[in-house]
Amino acid sequence: MYVIYCSSGKEMSVVRQLAEKNIRAYAPRRLVMERHFGRWVRREIFLFSGYVFLDEELTPDTWQAVKACYGTLRILSRSQLSPTEEEYIRFLCNDGHALGMSRGYVAGGALHITDGFLRRFEHKIIRYNKRGKRATADVTIYGRHYEITLGCEFDVPPVIPSISSGTAKYIL
Protein backbone atom coordinates (compact mmCIF):
# COMPACT_ATOMS: atom_id res chain seq x y z
CA MET A 1 0.00 0.00 0.00
CA TYR A 2 1.34 3.43 -0.99
CA VAL A 3 0.27 6.99 -0.17
CA ILE A 4 -0.57 9.49 -2.93
CA TYR A 5 -0.59 13.20 -2.17
CA CYS A 6 -3.26 15.03 -4.16
CA SER A 7 -4.98 18.40 -4.26
CA SER A 8 -7.32 18.91 -1.34
CA GLY A 9 -10.90 18.33 -2.43
CA LYS A 10 -9.87 16.12 -5.38
CA GLU A 11 -9.53 12.89 -3.37
CA MET A 12 -12.69 11.20 -4.68
CA SER A 13 -11.94 12.36 -8.23
CA VAL A 14 -8.51 10.67 -8.06
CA VAL A 15 -10.07 7.49 -6.60
CA ARG A 16 -12.67 7.42 -9.42
CA GLN A 17 -10.04 8.00 -12.13
CA LEU A 18 -7.91 5.17 -10.73
CA ALA A 19 -10.96 2.87 -10.47
CA GLU A 20 -11.63 3.45 -14.19
CA LYS A 21 -8.09 2.14 -14.82
CA ASN A 22 -8.76 -0.92 -12.58
CA ILE A 23 -6.46 0.34 -9.82
CA ARG A 24 -7.65 0.00 -6.21
CA ALA A 25 -7.36 3.23 -4.27
CA TYR A 26 -9.12 4.60 -1.20
CA ALA A 27 -9.76 7.98 0.40
CA PRO A 28 -10.84 7.15 3.99
CA ARG A 29 -13.94 9.05 5.15
CA ARG A 30 -15.80 9.32 8.45
CA LEU A 31 -19.33 10.18 9.52
CA VAL A 32 -19.61 12.90 12.16
CA MET A 33 -22.49 14.70 13.81
CA GLU A 34 -22.40 18.50 13.54
CA ARG A 35 -24.74 21.16 14.85
CA HIS A 36 -26.32 23.18 12.05
CA PHE A 37 -28.91 25.80 13.07
CA GLY A 38 -29.60 23.97 16.34
CA ARG A 39 -30.04 20.52 14.78
CA TRP A 40 -27.64 17.58 14.67
CA VAL A 41 -26.74 16.71 11.06
CA ARG A 42 -24.63 13.78 9.82
CA ARG A 43 -21.75 14.80 7.55
CA GLU A 44 -19.17 12.78 5.67
CA ILE A 45 -15.62 14.17 6.04
CA PHE A 46 -12.26 12.93 4.74
CA LEU A 47 -10.10 11.36 7.42
CA PHE A 48 -6.83 12.44 5.76
CA SER A 49 -7.52 15.48 3.61
CA GLY A 50 -5.35 15.50 0.48
CA TYR A 51 -4.26 11.84 0.73
CA VAL A 52 -5.29 8.77 -1.27
CA PHE A 53 -4.09 5.27 -0.42
CA LEU A 54 -3.05 3.09 -3.35
CA ASP A 55 -3.70 -0.62 -2.80
CA GLU A 56 -1.55 -1.97 -5.66
CA GLU A 57 2.06 -2.86 -6.40
CA LEU A 58 3.89 0.19 -7.73
CA THR A 59 4.92 -0.92 -11.23
CA PRO A 60 5.99 1.54 -13.96
CA ASP A 61 2.55 1.15 -15.61
CA THR A 62 0.76 1.87 -12.32
CA TRP A 63 3.04 4.86 -11.71
CA GLN A 64 2.19 6.30 -15.16
CA ALA A 65 -1.54 5.76 -14.55
CA VAL A 66 -1.30 7.55 -11.18
CA LYS A 67 0.64 10.46 -12.68
CA ALA A 68 -1.95 10.84 -15.45
CA CYS A 69 -4.79 11.40 -12.94
CA TYR A 70 -5.96 14.99 -12.64
CA GLY A 71 -5.37 16.22 -9.09
CA THR A 72 -2.46 13.91 -8.24
CA LEU A 73 0.61 15.79 -7.04
CA ARG A 74 3.08 13.04 -6.07
CA ILE A 75 3.58 9.72 -4.32
CA LEU A 76 4.78 10.39 -0.79
CA SER A 77 7.04 7.38 -0.42
CA ARG A 78 8.29 4.68 -2.73
CA SER A 79 8.58 2.27 0.19
CA GLN A 80 5.62 0.24 1.36
CA LEU A 81 3.91 0.75 4.70
CA SER A 82 4.82 -1.56 7.56
CA PRO A 83 2.37 -4.44 8.17
CA THR A 84 0.94 -2.70 11.28
CA GLU A 85 0.44 0.60 9.45
CA GLU A 86 -1.07 -1.19 6.47
CA GLU A 87 -3.51 -2.98 8.79
CA TYR A 88 -4.57 0.39 10.29
CA ILE A 89 -5.08 1.92 6.85
CA ARG A 90 -7.05 -1.06 5.50
CA PHE A 91 -9.23 -0.88 8.59
CA LEU A 92 -9.76 2.88 8.18
CA CYS A 93 -10.44 2.57 4.43
CA ASN A 94 -13.38 0.24 5.19
CA ASP A 95 -13.54 -0.97 1.55
CA GLY A 96 -14.32 2.55 0.34
CA HIS A 97 -17.22 3.18 2.72
CA ALA A 98 -17.34 5.95 5.33
CA LEU A 99 -16.58 4.96 8.93
CA GLY A 100 -19.77 5.02 10.98
CA MET A 101 -20.40 6.48 14.41
CA SER A 102 -19.08 4.56 17.40
CA ARG A 103 -20.90 4.24 20.73
CA GLY A 104 -19.41 4.41 24.19
CA TYR A 105 -19.69 5.75 27.72
CA VAL A 106 -17.47 7.65 30.13
CA ALA A 107 -16.73 6.07 33.51
CA GLY A 108 -14.06 7.30 35.88
CA GLY A 109 -12.79 9.88 33.39
CA ALA A 110 -12.01 7.21 30.77
CA LEU A 111 -13.90 6.54 27.55
CA HIS A 112 -15.06 2.94 27.07
CA ILE A 113 -16.19 2.05 23.54
CA THR A 114 -19.03 -0.49 23.33
CA ASP A 115 -19.63 -0.56 19.57
CA GLY A 116 -18.17 0.75 16.31
CA PHE A 117 -14.82 1.40 14.66
CA LEU A 118 -13.23 3.11 17.67
CA ARG A 119 -13.50 -0.13 19.62
CA ARG A 120 -10.34 -1.36 17.92
CA PHE A 121 -8.52 1.91 18.77
CA GLU A 122 -9.83 2.21 22.35
CA HIS A 123 -6.32 1.88 23.80
CA LYS A 124 -5.10 4.68 21.47
CA ILE A 125 -7.76 7.29 22.33
CA ILE A 126 -6.06 10.46 23.53
CA ARG A 127 -9.08 12.71 24.07
CA TYR A 128 -12.83 12.88 23.65
CA ASN A 129 -15.48 15.59 23.37
CA LYS A 130 -18.91 14.62 24.68
CA ARG A 131 -20.60 17.80 23.47
CA GLY A 132 -19.09 17.54 19.99
CA LYS A 133 -19.73 13.76 19.85
CA ARG A 134 -16.14 12.97 18.83
CA ALA A 135 -13.13 10.99 20.01
CA THR A 136 -9.51 11.38 18.85
CA ALA A 137 -7.07 8.46 18.50
CA ASP A 138 -3.34 8.41 17.69
CA VAL A 139 -2.18 6.44 14.62
CA THR A 140 1.39 6.06 13.28
CA ILE A 141 1.96 6.12 9.50
CA TYR A 142 5.48 6.15 8.00
CA GLY A 143 6.86 6.78 11.49
CA ARG A 144 4.82 9.97 12.02
CA HIS A 145 2.00 10.28 14.53
CA TYR A 146 -1.37 11.41 13.19
CA GLU A 147 -4.47 12.21 15.20
CA ILE A 148 -7.67 10.87 13.67
CA THR A 149 -10.99 12.15 14.93
CA LEU A 150 -14.00 9.87 14.60
CA GLY A 151 -17.65 10.33 15.52
CA CYS A 152 -18.79 8.85 18.83
CA GLU A 153 -22.19 8.89 20.50
CA PHE A 154 -22.08 8.80 24.28
CA ASP A 155 -24.44 6.65 26.34
CA VAL A 156 -25.14 6.55 30.07
CA PRO A 157 -22.63 4.23 31.81
CA PRO A 158 -24.10 0.86 32.80
CA VAL A 159 -25.17 0.48 36.41
CA ILE A 160 -23.20 -2.17 38.26
CA PRO A 161 -25.02 -3.55 41.32
CA SER A 162 -23.09 -3.32 44.55
CA ILE A 163 -22.02 -6.55 46.23
CA SER A 164 -23.38 -5.41 49.61
CA SER A 165 -26.98 -5.32 48.38
CA GLY A 166 -29.07 -8.43 48.95
CA THR A 167 -30.04 -8.92 45.29
CA ALA A 168 -26.51 -8.65 43.91
CA LYS A 169 -25.41 -12.05 45.19
CA TYR A 170 -28.15 -13.75 43.15
CA ILE A 171 -27.24 -11.87 39.95
CA LEU A 172 -23.59 -12.87 40.04
Residue ranges with predicted function:
Residues 132-134:
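A generic structural signal for beta-strand entry/edge sites
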